[in-house]
Regions:
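Bacterial N-terminal signal peptides that target proteins for export
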Residues: 2-14
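Low-complexity, acidic/polar, glycine-enriched regions of mature
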Residues: 26-229
Length: 229
């Protein structure tokens, strides 16, 4: 004879297990758990306006100088690092605009990063700081924005067009360049590139061996800059 009490007890136990294992399991990723420390910040988590100080130690700002002339194949292109610069960026979140950017570079902080001998490095840097930039006479290179426009491309990410006055070697000219801007909770990162002609700023490109080896007039700048609130 079947023990009804035992049978019903086992049946209830089986039903309880079935209910437990049928419940949905909580998935932290499904709830939007943060899986990246540097995930772009949502606009709702940022203040209305932001003021950021540029961090040169966490940034990269370089110049490429290219060789030209009949014997350019015997020369080398040079990569120059801008090491000492300060600045401030101001943005209005969601729309970006109005916004502003100011950057001050120490002229004597430009350094050659190519693999060359110490003596060659010194010669190149002495020429660059002395004959080209005249760093003693013009110790700072200054950029001040006049207009900044931007369009949103994703959460916390924008494509910006920045125009402003660049003062280099005692000459001020207007320049315009594109930059990507990504906002994080306590910082921003901007990346881009632009070109300049040395002659526009009263600089005569370096030339040796009767002009058979010389530096091209056009220089290419690229930047990856981090700024913190």
């Amino acid at each position: 004879m079947i023990n009804r009490k035992g049978f019903y007890r086992r049946l209830l136990y089986a039903l309880a297990l079935l209910i437990v294992f049928s419940l949905p399991v909580s998935d932290p990723l499904a709830k939007g758990a943060r899986v990246e420390a540097d995930k772009p910040a949502a606009a709702s988590r940022l203040p209305a306006e932001g003021r950021y100080k540029i961090s040169a130690g966490h940034s990269r700002f370089i110049v490429r100088a290219f060789a030209s002339g009949l014997l350019s194949a015997l020369a080398h292109d040079h990569t120059i690092s801008i090491r000492d610069f300060t600045g401030e960026a101001r943005f209005t979140y969601v729309t970006i605009e109005p916004a502003s950017l100011q950057l001050i570079i120490k002229s004597d902080s430009l350094a050659v990063t190519d693999k060359v001998s110490d003596s060659d490095r010194k010669k190149i840097e002495d020429t660059m700081r002395g004959e080209v930039l005249e760093a003693d006479k013009y110790p700072e290179i200054i950029f001040k924005s006049t207009t900044v426009t931007a369009s949103r491309i994703d959460e916390g990410k924008y494509q910006a067009k920045i125009s402003g006055d660049l003062t280099l070697h005692g000459t001020t000219r207007n320049v315009t360049f594109d930059a990507s801007v990504t906002f994080y909770e306590a910082s921003l990162r901007t990346q881009g590139q632009f070109t300049l002609k040395q002659s526009d700023y009263g600089i005569k490109p370096v030339s040796v061996a009767g002009g058979t080896i010389k530096v091209k007039n056009e220089l290419k700048f690229s930047f990856d800059i981090v700024a913190n609130r």
